[in-house]
């Protein structure tokens, strides 16, 4: 059984499968594999026709059991926009379970909630600290660069997969509502695909 991601950026192509496999392992949903992401521009993911086209392509991939659309909210409100996008996606999914998750405001906000675990990775300074409101800054990538040596820059294609591999999932869950939405959606998709997680989310994350 494969969960098929649809993403927006080059960094997401490498990072999102890593993240989903980490969630899969935490959930002990061993029968669930992660497909190669189908990438579309953000402008295409917020329009009905192009979103539905992407979902149809994903649904046709071999052994696709569920579809996850994941991209940055930017200045949009996930609570307002995501339900409409998910409705459109479900119309095109051919009966397959499908979820839309918008990282608020950017995927990198999840790193800002877990900086202590990322020290020494991708140039993150050894004394860097997490942001107290990681989903508030508009420029999460810039916030990451403030936690790097002067002159260092963040590269999504290089750094996003590295930081994803070392992200403290519990810290991201506790600090970011949109990450909690991702965790919830992942569990629901796994169940719908016939691969029920053990205890989800892990009890340690919610205690």
Q: Each predicted region: which residue ranges?
A:
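C-terminal accessory helical subdomains adjacent to catalytic cores in phosphodiester-
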Residues: 2-3, 12-41, 45-207
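Short hydrophobic beta-strand that contains or immediately precedes a catalytic carboxylate
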Residues: 5-7
């Amino acid at each position: 059984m494969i969960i098929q991601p649809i993403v927006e950026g080059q960094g997401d192509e490498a990072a999102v499968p890593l993240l989903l496999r980490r969630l899969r392992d935490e959930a002990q949903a061993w029968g669930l594999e992660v497909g190669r992401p189908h990438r579309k521009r953000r402008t295409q993911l917020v329009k009905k026709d192009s979103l539905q086209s992407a979902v149809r392509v994903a649904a046709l991939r071999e052994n696709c059991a569920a579809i996850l659309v994941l991209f940055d909210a930017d200045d949009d409100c996930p609570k307002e926009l995501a339900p409409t996008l998910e409705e459109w996606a479900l119309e095109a999914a051919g009966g397959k379970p499908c979820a839309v998750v918008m990282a608020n405001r950017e995927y990198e906000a999840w790193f800002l909630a877990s900086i202590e675990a990322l020290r020494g990775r991708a140039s993150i300074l050894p004394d860097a600290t997490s942001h107290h409101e990681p989903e508030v800054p508009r420029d999460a990538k810039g916030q990451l660069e403030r936690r790097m040596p002067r002159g260092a820059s963040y590269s999504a294609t290089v750094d996003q997969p590295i930081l994803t591999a070392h992200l403290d999932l519990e810290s991201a869950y506790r600090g970011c509502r949109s990450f909690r939405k991702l965790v919830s959606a992942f569990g629901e998709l796994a169940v719908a695909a016939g691969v029920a997680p053990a205890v989800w989310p892990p009890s340690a994350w919610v205690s």
